C-alpha cells in the first residue's frame, strides 16, 4: 500500500503544517477610528513569521495598535492620523488626499478594513491617478489597484526590504525560517522518492518516465505533477 503524499498530509491539518499563530505579536492593522489624532511610536518589535517589523503606536486617547513599520520610523516619533494629516513619513492619511507619485504602504481597499495591499517587507504602492471616488495605486507587482478615496494608508515603504539580500548560509537557518510558517521543510522531490512514496518515484533514475500531466478529477493519491495542464515544457520559438 502506498504512502500519503505531502499535500494529503497537509490537508489533514497536523501540527507540522499549521501556522503557529500563538507566536504572533498581534494583528497589524489601522484602527477603525474617526477624527484627528496624534500618536507616538512607543516600540518597534519583531513579529515571528514575518519579515516586516511592527510599530506599536499609542494615540492621544490611549488607544494602542500595531501597524507594519515603515523605513525611517523611530521610537518616540510623533505621527498624525486623520483626514488632514500631513503627507509625511509614517503618518496615516486618506488615500484621496495623497498627491500622485507619493509612496504609501499598508493600503486599505475600503475604509475600515485595516490594510490589504503592500504589507510585506520592502513593498509599497505609488498613487498614479484618481477617478471619481476611486484612487489608482500601482503596486510592487506592477498591477494597478483601485481603492476608495476615503481609504487610509501609511506614508512610506514597509521596513525590512533587505532581508532577502542576506544569505541563509546553512540549512539550520532555513529550518528556523520555516519553523514559524505554515509550511513543511525540507521539500523532497517526487523523483527522488521510492515508488511507494510518490507516483514519480522509483526506477533508479531521476525522471518521471511517464506523462506528468494528470486529470483534474484524479484521486488524491495520484493527483500530483502538472494538474490539468493545457501545455508543458518550453514554448515553441522561445
From Swiss-Prot:
The keyword Membrane does not apply. GO terms for biological process: cytoplasmic translation. Pfam families: Ribosomal_L2, Ribosomal_L2_C. One of its GO terms (cellular component) is cytosolic large ribosomal subunit. Transmembrane segments: none annotated. Residues 206-216 have a biased composition (Polar residues). It comes from the Archaea. PANTHER family: LARGE RIBOSOMAL SUBUNIT PROTEIN UL2, RIBOSOMAL PROTEIN L2. Belongs to the universal ribosomal protein uL2 family. One of the primary rRNA binding proteins. Required for association of the 30S and 50S subunits to form the 70S ribosome, for tRNA binding and peptide bond formation. It has been suggested to have peptidyltransferase activity; this is somewhat controversial. Makes several contacts with the 16S rRNA in the 70S ribosome. This is Large ribosomal subunit protein uL2. The gene is rpl2.
Amino acid at each position: 500500500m502506498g504512502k500519503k503524499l505531502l499535500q494529503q498530509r497537509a490537508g489533514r491539518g497536523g501540527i507540522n503544517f499549521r501556522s503557529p499563530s500563538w507566536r504572533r505579536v498581534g494583528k497589524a492593522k489601522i484602527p477603525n477610528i474617526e477624527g484627528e489624532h496624534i500618536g507616538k511610536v512607543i516600540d518597534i518589535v519583531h513579529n515571528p513569521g514575518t519579515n516586516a517589523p511592527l510599530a506599536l503606536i499609542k494615540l492621544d486617547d490611549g488607544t494602542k495598535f500595531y501597524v507594519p513599520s515603515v523605513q525611517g520610523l523611530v521610537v518616540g516619533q510623533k505621527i498624525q492620523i486623520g483626514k488632514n494629516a500631513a503627507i509625511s513619513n509614517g503618518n496615516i492619511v486618506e488615500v484621496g488626499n495623497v498627491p500622485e507619485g507619493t509612496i504609501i504602504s499598508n493600503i486599505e481597499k475600503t475604509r475600515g478594513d485595516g490594510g490589504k495591499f503592500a504589507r510585506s517587507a520592502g513593498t509599497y504602492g505609488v498613487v498614479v491617478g484618481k477617478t471619481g471616488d476611486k484612487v489608482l495605486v500601482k503596486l510592487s507587482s506592477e498591477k494597478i489597484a483601485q481603492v476608495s478615496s476615503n481609504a487610509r494608508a501609511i506614508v512610506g515603504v514597509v521596513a525590512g526590504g533587505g532581508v532577502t539580500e542576506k544569505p541563509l548560509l546553512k540549512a539550520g537557518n532555513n529550518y528556523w525560517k520555516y519553523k514559524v510558517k505554515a509550511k513543511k521543510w525540507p521539500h523532497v522531490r517526487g523523483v527522488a522518492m521510492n515508488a511507494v512514496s510518490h507516483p514519480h518515484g522509483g526506477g533508479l533514475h531521476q525522471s518521471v518516465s511517464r506523462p506528468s500531466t494528470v486529470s483534474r478529477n484524479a484521486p488524491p493519491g495520484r493527483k500530483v505533477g502538472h494538474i490539468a495542464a493545457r501545455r508543458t515544457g518550453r514554448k515553441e520559438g522561445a
